[in-house]
A protein has these predicted regions:
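N-terminal secretory targeting signals
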Residues: 2-126, 364-380
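Hydrophobic alpha-helical segments and their boundary regions
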Residues: 11, 15, 19-20, 123, ...
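Secondary-structure junction/capping motif
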Residues: 62, 187, 199, 226, ...
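Active-site-adjacent loops and short helices of periplasmic peptidoglycan-processing enzymes
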Residues: 89-94, 98-263, 267-276, 333
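Domain-terminus/edge residues, biased toward the C-terminal soluble/receptor-binding domains
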Residues: 243-247, 253-380
Length: 380
């Protein structure tokens, strides 16, 4: 079974997933060819014939230049899809320089590297890991690579929220974002600038709803005992929930070392669902905060919460290259509480499309235990 390739953490250190994206920059400066003036005019020719001769020569040069340009364009055509071209012209300059930057394809996710995407399933999901459970009975309804241990990105923030609320720290306490809360591993940005001050409650709100990374980082730093104590509490909470495939290295999920399995995540979702604030904050559509400098309007990272046809009780999205597109949800379908875990999906909208495929399947009468193994795949 492919899942046997994975074990918490050991798999993570062996995979060649830290491939740096190399960027090759070259400067292309256009040169302008100027025809030399004739030193001596032919006296036997009239002015009119001289002009005609010059015109003919000019046409020959133009045709030759066009042929050369076409040849160069044809040679460069296969590489154009790999280059981003920017024209840079500074103030007072008379020429511009064309900068061509070659990009390598996005690095593989862990699931791609270990062949999890080779597992087919009856619903043709883009997610390499999928697990759907009847929340009331804990009965698995759909299973695809549910034992595989993979990075979970910002799904980690559900555990972050539980640890924050378990600490009983005052929700009204003001928390300031500092340089320590920047993302130095992935280099991601944030609208929450250094020096911003929000209440613990607001930080938790935007961390869950909008996956605001600096908010999650600041929450861990303000924990009693600091960030190391917070991470220890996350792992202790996971252990107490019986999450044996799970390990956390930070509160944001911006590391490939935050790993879990779909089966473990069902346990985490069930636990998080018991917190009313987590349910409310994670399913809000929009929320405005005042940072002490300005007001910021945040929107949910999950478009499905804005879709009235969905009844979502809890949700969280996640993405880093190593994890792919991730989505976990508690939702009600035909009066039945359902937990969905979709990990390592490829494509910007693929995770929500997969959720819709699962719901349509359940709407059509699906619901008996269906695994990738009994639909012709190589096992889960």
């Amino acid at each position: 079974m492919k899942a046997s390739l994975f074990s918490p953490l050991k798999m993570m250190h062996g995979a060649a997933l830290g491939t740096a994206v190399s960027v090759a920059v070259s400067m292309l400066v256009a040169s302008v060819a100027v025809a030399p003036a004739d030193a001596v005019a032919a006296p036997a020719k009239s002015t009119k014939s001289a002009k005609a001769a010059a015109s003919a020569k000019g046409k020959k040069r133009t045709v030759a230049a066009e042929k050369k340009a076409a040849h160069v364009a044809a040679a460069e055509a296969p590489h154009r899809s790999r280059r981003h071209v920017t024209l840079a012209a500074g103030p007072g300059r008379h020429h511009g320089a064309v900068r061509r930057v070659a990009f390598q394809p996005r690095q593989q996710s862990v699931g791609q590297a270990f062949g999890l995407h080779d597992t087919s399933d009856a619903l043709a999901l883009r997610s390499s890991v999928a697990y759907v459970v009847d929340q009331a009975t804990s009965e698995p309804l759909f299973d695809k690579n549910s034992h595989a241990v993979v990075p979970i990105a910002s799904i980690s923030k559900l555990m972050t929220a539980m640890v924050v609320l378990d600490s009983k720290a005052p929700l009204e306490e003001q928390i300031e974002v500092t340089d320590e809360d920047r993302d130095y591993e992935k280099g991601t940005g944030s609208r929450l600038s250094v020096g911003s001050v929000l209440s613990r409650e607001d930080m938790l709100h935007i961390a869950l709803m909008a996956s605001e990374n600096r908010a999650a980082a600041a929450l861990s730093r303000y924990y009693p005992g600091g960030r190391p104590a917070f991470i220890a509490a996350m792992n202790a909470k996971a252990k107490s929930l019986g999450m044996t495939d799970t390990h956390f290295e930070n509160s944001t999920g911006l590391t490939s070392l935050n790993v879990s399995s779909a089966r473990d995540l069902v346990k985490m979702i069930d636990a998080a669902y018991q917190y009313p604030l987590i349910r409310r904050f994670s399913t809000d559509r929009t929320y405005t905060v005042f940072t002490g400098k300005r007001s910021l309007v945040y929107n949910s990272t999950n478009a499905l919460v804005r879709n009235p046809s969905w009844d979502i009780g809890l949700q969280k999205t996640g993405f880093i290259n190593e994890a792919g597109e991730c989505l976990v949800m508690q939702t009600t379908i035909h009066g039945k509480p359902i937990v969905m875990v979709l990990l390592d999906s490829f494509g910007k909208y693929s995770r929500t499309a997969d959720a819709s495929r699962v719901r349509n399947w359940l709407d059509a009468g699906g619901g008996e235990r269906l695994t990738a193994a009994n639909t012709g795949a190589g096992g889960t």
